[in-house]
C-alpha cells in the first residue's frame, strides 16, 4: 500500500508543519506529499490508492473538492470551518457532504467541526488534535531554567520579564512563507523538532497558540494558554481543550503573580484523547482498499480532469483574491469607522466631562464671588450702619449738651 502525508507548502504558520510532523510517525513510509489545498488534483504515479491520514484544516479555500479518487482517506483530527471566506459560508459543506458520508465517521479536531457536521447529518465524533500524540524527543536537558513566550502580547512578555529572575526566551509560530517554501519537508520537520526541543526543556511555556500548547502537554512541559478576551473565532477553536489546558484571559494573567504561575502543573485529562487517537490511527491506517480496478486511468484523469480543474481553480483563486481584496478594504474601512466612532464617543464623553467640570468650576467661582460680594455688602452695610449710629449718637449728645 502507498501512503501520503498531508502538507501545506505555502503555510505562514509552523503549526501546520507541526501537525504534519505529528502524523508522520504513524505512516510506515511516505510515498507522496499530498498538498492540503490541492487535494482535488492529486495524481499518483500509478493507478493505485494512496492511504492518507486526514489531519488538519481542509477546504480553507472552500472550492477544492471532491478530493482526488486516488486518495483513500482516514479522517481524524479534521477541521472544517463555517466562517465566511470569500463570500462562501456553508455551501461547500453541503456539496462535500456525500464524500464525507462515504468515508465517515469523521474524527473532528474540535467542537466547531463536530457541530458543523452534525448540522448536515454527517456521522462524526470528536477525536481531538493529532499534536497531542507527539512523543518526547531525545535531547539533553537545559543547564539553566527558562520561560518560553510564544506569540503573546508585548504586555504579557514584559510582565513576565519584570517579575522573574529566570531567562525569558521568545519564539513565534509565524513563518516567512517564501523562505519556508525553499526548504525541503525534511528540513522543515527538522525545524519543528528544534522548536519542540525548546518547548520540552522549558520550565514554563506561555502561549496564545493552540498548536504550541497541545504539543507541550504531550511533551510534559508546563504550559499556560493566554486567551484572546474578545475573539469569538479563537474561543471556538480552544473550547474543545479547555478541560485539559490551564488558561487565562490576558487581563487575568497580568494580575497573577509569576511565582504562582511557576508552580503550575499540567492536567492529565489530555491522556485519554492522546491514547484514543493513537489507537484509532494504528487500527485504521493500514486498512487496505481492494477496489483499485474502479479507479480512472492516471494519464486520462490527468489530461482530462486535472488540467481542466487547475484552470478552473486558478480562475476561482483570482476571483477569490479579488473578493478578498475588496473584503479586506471594506474590513479596514469598517475598522477605521469603528475607531473614529469610538474615539468620537470617547471624545464626546470627555468633552461632556470637561464641560461639566468647567461648569462646576465656574459655578463654584460664581457662588464664591457672589458670597464674597454679599459678605462685602453686608460688611459695608454693617460698617456704615455702625458709623451712622455712632454719628447719630454723637449728634444727640451734642444736641443734648447744647440744651
Model regions and ranges:
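Residues forming the hydrophobic interface stripe of long heptad-repeat coiled-coil alpha-helices
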Residues: 344, 348-351, 355-362, 366-384, ...
Amino acid at each position: 500500500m502507498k501512503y501520503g502525508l498531508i502538507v501545506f507548502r505555502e503555510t505562514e504558520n509552523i503549526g501546520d508543519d507541526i501537525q504534519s510532523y505529528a502524523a508522520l510517525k504513524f505512516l510506515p513510509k511516505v510515498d507522496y506529499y499530498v498538498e492540503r489545498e490541492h487535494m482535488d488534483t492529486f495524481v499518483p504515479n500509478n493507478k493505485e490508492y494512496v492511504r492518507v491520514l486526514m489531519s488538519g484544516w481542509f477546504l480553507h479555500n472552500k472550492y477544492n473538492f471532491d478530493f482526488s479518487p486516488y486518495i483513500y482517506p482516514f479522517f481524524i483530527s479534521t477541521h472544517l470551518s463555517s466562517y465566511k471566506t470569500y463570500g462562501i459560508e456553508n455551501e461547500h459543506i453541503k456539496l462535500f457532504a456525500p464524500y464525507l458520508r462515504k468515508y465517515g465517521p469523521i474524527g473532528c479536531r474540535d467542537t466547531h467541526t463536530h457541530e458543523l457536521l452534525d448540522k448536515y447529518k454527517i456521522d462524526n465524533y470528536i477525536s481531538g488534535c493529532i499534536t497531542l500524540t507527539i512523543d518526547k524527543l531525545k535531547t539533553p536537558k537545559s543547564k539553566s531554567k527558562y520561560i518560553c513566550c510564544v506569540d503573546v502580547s508585548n504586555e504579557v512578555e514584559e510582565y513576565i520579564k519584570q517579575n522573574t529572575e529566570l531567562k525569558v526566551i521568545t519564539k513565534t509560530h509565524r513563518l516567512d512563507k517564501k523562505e519556508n517554501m525553499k526548504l525541503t519537508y525534511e528540513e522543515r520537520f527538522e525545524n519543528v523538532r528544534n522548536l519542540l526541543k525548546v518547548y520540552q526543556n522549558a520550565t514554563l511555556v506561555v502561549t496564545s497558540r493552540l498548536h504550541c500548547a497541545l504539543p507541550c502537554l504531550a511533551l510534559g512541559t508546563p504550559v499556560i494558554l493566554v486567551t484572546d478576551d474578545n475573539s469569538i473565532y479563537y474561543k471556538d477553536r480552544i473550547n474543545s481543550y479547555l478541560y485539559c489546558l490551564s488558561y487565562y484571559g490576558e487581563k487575568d494573567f497580568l494580575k497573577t503573580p509569576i511565582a504562582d504561575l511557576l508552580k503550575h502543573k499540567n492536567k492529565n485529562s489530555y491522556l485519554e484523547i492522546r491514547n484514543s487517537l493513537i489507537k484509532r490511527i494504528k487500527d485504521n491506517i493500514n486498512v487496505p482498499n481492494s477496489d483499485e480496478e474502479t479507479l480512472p486511468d492516471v494519464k486520462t484523469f490527468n489530461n482530462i480532469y486535472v488540467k481542466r480543474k487547475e484552470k478552473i481553480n486558478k480562475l476561482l483563486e483570482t476571483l477569490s483574491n479579488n473578493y478578498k481584496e475588496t473584503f479586506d478594504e471594506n474590513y479596514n474601512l469598517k475598522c477605521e469607522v469603528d475607531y473614529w466612532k469610538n474615539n468620537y464617543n470617547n471624545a464626546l464623553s470627555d468633552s461632556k466631562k470637561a464641560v461639566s467640570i468647567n461648569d462646576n468650576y465656574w459655578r463654584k467661582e460664581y457662588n464664591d464671588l457672589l458670597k464674597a460680594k454679599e459678605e462685602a455688602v453686608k460688611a459695608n452695610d454693617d460698617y456704615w450702619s455702625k458709623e451712622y449710629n455712632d454719628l447719630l449718637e454723637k449728634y444727640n449728645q451734642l444736641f443734648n449738651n447744647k440744651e
